[in-house]
């Protein structure tokens, strides 16, 4: 599941103690890829995206065939991207509500509106480019996971979800097919493939996939 339970203070303390232990290991042996990976996992569990990504990258630098480091780095990069976007959305909502207070009238006010619009457009383009770059980084990590371990079903599933986020439904369906081929009872893959097919106008097969997901236990997770 993608839902994560909040950690208790005691659990957080355990992870930070573990981080200290891994740090000591790294100090003794700076080339220990497993220590970087372990420390990354602890950072991941305390929701420190940046440090987790940094440590997964350190593990990969020392062991370029470290499949799970690529996979978890992709997961963390996506979580960081989603968090950043949610924070920006909150800020944009606040800015929008605040902008309603500006009731200036006249040429100077109109000029300011035009200038703000121009800045907003440039800002939106920069955000789109940054998001595209971040999606590409995540995609490359999943590509590497699949290259190193072609049977890793969740790499196909997560890559398919990323492609849906990019609205590349055709490519997403191909990846969902690969996931389902490797795990014929993967309910979430049927469900998401059904949504992707519906987005393409493939209604009959889309509904069939949603029904299959329901048979496999997804029905109660997605009530009407």
Residue ranges and their predicted role:
Residues 1-224:
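Alpha-helical tetratricopeptide repeat
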């Amino acid at each position: 599941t993608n839902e994560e339970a909040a950690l208790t203070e005691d659990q957080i303390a355990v992870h930070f103690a573990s981080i200290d232990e891994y740090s000591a290991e790294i100090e003794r042996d700076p080339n220990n890829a497993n220590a970087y990976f372990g420390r990354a996992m602890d950072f991941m569990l305390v929701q420190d995206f940046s440090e987790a990504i940094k440590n997964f990258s350190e593990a990969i630098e020392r062991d370029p065939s470290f499949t799970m480091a690529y996979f978890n780095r992709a997961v963390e990069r996506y979580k960081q991207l989603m968090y950043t976007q949610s924070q920006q959305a909150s800020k944009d909502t606040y800015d929008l509500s605040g902008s309603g207070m500006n009731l200036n009238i006249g040429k100077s006010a109109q000029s300011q509106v035009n200038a703000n619009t121009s800045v907003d457009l440039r800002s939106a383009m920069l955000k789109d480019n940054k998001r595209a770059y971040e999606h590409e980084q995540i995609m490359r990590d999943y590509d590497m996971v699949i290259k190193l371990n072609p049977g890793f079903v969740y790499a196909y599933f997560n890559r398919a979800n990323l492609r849906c986020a990019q609205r590349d439904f055709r490519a997403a369906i191909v990846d969902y097919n690969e996931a389902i081929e490797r795990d014929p009872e993967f309910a979430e893959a049927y469900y998401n493939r059904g949504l992707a097919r519906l987005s393409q106008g493939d209604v009959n097969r889309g509904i069939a996939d949603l029904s299959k997901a329901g048979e496999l236990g997804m029905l109660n997770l997605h009530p009407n």
